[in-house]
Design a protein with these regions (language model features):
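A short beta-strand segment in extracellular, disulfide-stabilized domains
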Residues: 411-420, 493-497
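Surface-exposed coil/turn segments at beta-strand junctions on protein surfaces, enriched
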Residues: 20, 85, 138, 240, ...
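C-terminal outer-membrane/trafficking sorting elements
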Residues: 423-432, 440, 444-451, 455-462, ...
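Non-cytosolic beta-sheet module surface loops
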Residues: 107, 160, 211, 418, ...
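Extracellular and select intracellular beta-sandwich modules with Ser/Thr-enriched
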Residues: 232, 292, 348, 462-467, ...
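Bacterial Sec-dependent N-terminal signal peptides
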Residues: 1-9, 475
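Conserved beta-strand/short-helix segments
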Residues: 6-401
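Terminal edge beta-strands and adjacent linker/stalk segments
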Residues: 130, 465-471
Length: 553
């Protein structure tokens, strides 16, 4: 495999501020998948209730072109959405769908998650007048402590950590069936639902239970099979007491990569208050969750590495909040960006520091799907001129270079496979990177010795892989097309029908990870592979190779 991962500076784009003292603006933040819209929670805002704090509200901003100044800026979109009661901490967590036209707001003081859609007047209209709540027969669960919404805005999850539950709803307008599976998802552990995140389809969810086992913490992943939520793989656990593994979690779009923040981690298990922190990434290999690379650890006491985490859509870029870091100045906090280069997590650029003492930058972080837009919440930050007695909170937005999955180009003889769900153009490196005519498929079979690369376009971003040298001693590795794979889509077994003998079949996920190898057989059992898109490579006995995309349902 090879990769492209440049050191990118994230440039400060704009600063958004809370409207009043002690708003705690930036307590929560989320970016739309396209990176054009941002939602911010401010749990300290009084929301119109006189002399009462911690009511909370949420604001939404959209990146808008101003013709008068010939520039782009983040502009308030629609009305601010206030709490409907006092002391309910509305905005404790927030979520937004891919195009930024549907939002969810957690209100744990009411055990409620409210859903809004952007209407034709550019205001926010409630999708359900009462929001989505726990059953009236159940005691308070702090539901809404964590929330998430899927890419098209039709599935939403609400963590209820005092009940160790996650309430997951089908909220599709006019046809949504309400609570999926008919019951909330009951998750083992203590404070389960303290953190949640959905995949893009809304069929997978990662759940943190960070107070489990003397606050070692644990994380579980579930898939929806059409009727029930079923645990996928093993329970992931922290190492030491008070690690708080699962304090925050993030899931890639395909649901096969998760990032887990452990804000309380310390290499010395006897230290219960140092909170250096650690963040770990796991990939699904078809049967288990396997750690990807080394864990990323804080450096100093009170760093709280992993207080907040966010993955790009493809899971190859990660933003980590170090909320308590004293590196710049006391409790300024910081955020670091890491890119996966194919073998390790590499820090991208310099840390982004909070701009003053005790602003707690990194309390919340969010990345767009392509990893180019970054939002950072600092709950006690201020603007250039502090017009308030106390800090109102801030969110700073940054823009950098997008990230493309060029880390998964696989070479097999004279066959190159770009394993990414994207568009392709193969290039001739020995001819000034000139495009090869009609070479726009995922697989390229070189007919001549030389050096070749691929230009991949994904989520509006384009990058080029490194060059691969091809030495051809024969042309036996030709691309084979005369075979049939069925059924496709499949829920279980696939069969390859060909006149040629099959030596080996390999199944890879969209990130290029090998999921399954089958030798000397024309069938493959996918029963233990989670739903999604995969790539099947077939090695025939004549040296030929076949490739096909398969969909596991």
């Amino acid at each position: 495999m090879n990769s492209v991962s440049a050191q990118v500076t994230f440039n400060h784009d704009q600063e958004l501020l809370g409207e009043a003292s002690d708003d705690l603006f930036g307590w929560s933040v989320d970016l739309s998948g396209d990176g054009n819209t941002i939602i911010v929670g401010a749990i300290g805002n009084n929301a119109g209730f006189a002399n009462v704090s911690n009511n909370g509200h949420a604001r939404v901003y959209r990146n808008t072109f101003n013709a008068s100044f010939n520039s782009w800026s983040w502009v308030l979109l629609g009305q601010e959405i206030n709490a409907t009661a006092s002391s309910v901490e509305s905005g404790y967590d927030v979520g937004i769908n891919y195009d930024g036209n549907a939002i969810v707001i957690g209100t744990p003081g009411q055990d409620r998650m409210r859903v809004y859609d952007l209407n034709v007047s550019d205001n926010w209209s409630p999708r359900n007048s009462n929001g989505y709540t726990i059953s009236s027969s159940q005691s308070a669960q702090r539901a809404g402590h964590s929330v998430s919404i899927n890419g098209n805005g039709n599935v939403a999850a609400m963590g209820a950590p005092l009940g160790n539950k996650v309430w997951i709803f089908d909220i599709e307008p006019n046809v949504g069936t309400g609570l999926m599976s008919g019951n909330p998802l009951v998750v083992p552990g203590t404070y389960a639902g303290g953190s949640v995140d959905l995949d893009d389809e809304g069929n997978s969810v990662v759940v943190g239970a960070y107070k489990s086992n003397s606050e070692r913490g644990q994380v579980l992943v579930y898939d929806f099979n059409g009727a029930n939520w079923v645990q996928r793989g093993q329970i992931l656990s922290g190492v030491n007491n008070y690690d708080q593994f699962g304090f925050d979690v993030s899931m890639s779009n395909d649901g096969n990569t998760i990032a887990v923040g452990s804000k309380g981690w310390d290499s010395n298990p006897n230290n219960t208050t140092y909170e250096i922190g650690e963040t770990t990434v796991y990939d699904w290999n078809g049967s288990n969750w396997v750690q990807r690379g080394s864990s990323i650890q804080g450096i100093n006491i009170f760093d709280q590495c992993g207080f907040s985490v966010s993955l790009s859509g493809n899971g190859n870029r990660m933003a980590i909040g170090y909320k308590g870091s004293n590196e710049a100045t006391t409790a300024a906090g910081l955020v670091r960006i890491f890119d996966w280069n194919g073998t390790a997590w590499v820090q991208n650029g310099d840390p982004i520091y909070g701009d003053g003492a005790s602003v707690y930058s990194g309390h919340s972080v969010a990345l767009s799907d392509n990893g180019s837009i970054l939002a950072i919440g600092a709950i006690q930050g201020t603007g250039p001129i502090n017009e308030f007695t106390n800090q109102q909170g801030q969110v700073r937005v940054y823009e950098g270079e997008c990230l493309v999955s060029t880390s998964a180009v696989i070479q097999n003889g004279n066959t190159l496979t770009a394993v990414a769900n994207a568009s392709y153009q193969w290039l001739d490196c020995n001819n000034g990177n000139q495009p090869i005519p009609n070479a726009i498929e995922q697989v390229y079979v070189a007919q001549n010795p030389g050096s070749y690369s691929v230009q991949i376009t994904e989520n509006g971003c384009t990058q080029t892989s490194a060059c691969f040298d091809i030495t051809i001693t024969s042309l036996k590795n030709e691309k084979i097309d005369n075979f049939l794979v069925f059924p496709n889509p499949t829920s279980n077994i696939i069969t390859v029908n060909s006149d040629l003998f099959i030596q080996e079949m390999q199944i890879l996920d969209v990130a290029g990870k090998l999921i399954l190898t089958i030798s000397n057989s024309n069938t493959a059992d996918l029963i233990n592979i989670s739903p999604g898109i995969y790539f099947l490579t077939i090695q025939f006995n004549n040296g030929g190779i076949g490739h096909v995309k398969i969909l596991k349902q």
